[in-house]
Amino acid sequence: MLTKKYSEELEKVFSFLNEIGIAIIEKELDEATFLPGLSLGSNCIYIDSDKLLYPGDILHEAGHLAVTTTSERKLIGTQAMSSEWPTQGDEIGAILWSYAALYHLELPLEFVFHPNGYKNNSDWYISNFNSGNYIGLPLLQWMGLTLSESQAIIENKKAFPVMQKWIRD
């Protein structure tokens, strides 16, 4: 149960994440984190709203949880999780997953792909996504999360950016 009042966009994000099984937990984060105000745990995102700089980063972090296998996801935030996590593939998957979430939630791409994110390459990602160049799509399809256009036709289902499921098995 969230105790603070958040923007309409964040309330929409929190509702979506709750629906797919990713908990949002308000918590004061004393330690330094990669993204200010955010830390990951097993199927949850810890949020320190006083330190959170870019609310859209929550969706990106949710993408990391979503593209991680169930067996590894339960280790996130513990010493048992590999120091190699997330891999470059996980990063690519989380980026594309967050794009699909934005599409699903009907939020602007700049909500996640803000000017100070992605090593100042947010405009490059936005341009690629707007052109239908979905970097990492074969990976998300391999993970069983979505379908390419050609596979969607074969299976008579909707193609990416529509997701077949949001959380990897």
Regions flagged by a language model, labelled:
Residues 1-41, 51, 100, 104:
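Auxiliary, metal-adjacent structural segments of Zn-dependent hydrolase domains
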Residues 9, 55, 90:
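Hydrophobic (often cysteine-bearing) scaffold residues that line and stabilize catalytic clefts
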Residues 42-57:
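Short pre-active-site segment immediately N-terminal to the catalytic Zn-binding motif
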Residues 56-69:
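Active-site recognition of the HExxH zinc-binding catalytic motif
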Residues 67-98, 111-114, 118:
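Post-HEXXH active-site segment of zinc metalloproteases
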Residues 96-103, 144-145:
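Short, hydrophobic/amphipathic alpha-helical patches that form generic packing surfaces
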Residues 108-120, 124-128:
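Catalytic and binding regions of secreted/periplasmic enzymes and modules that target cell-wall glycans
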Residues 125-169:
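Pan-zinc metallopeptidase signature
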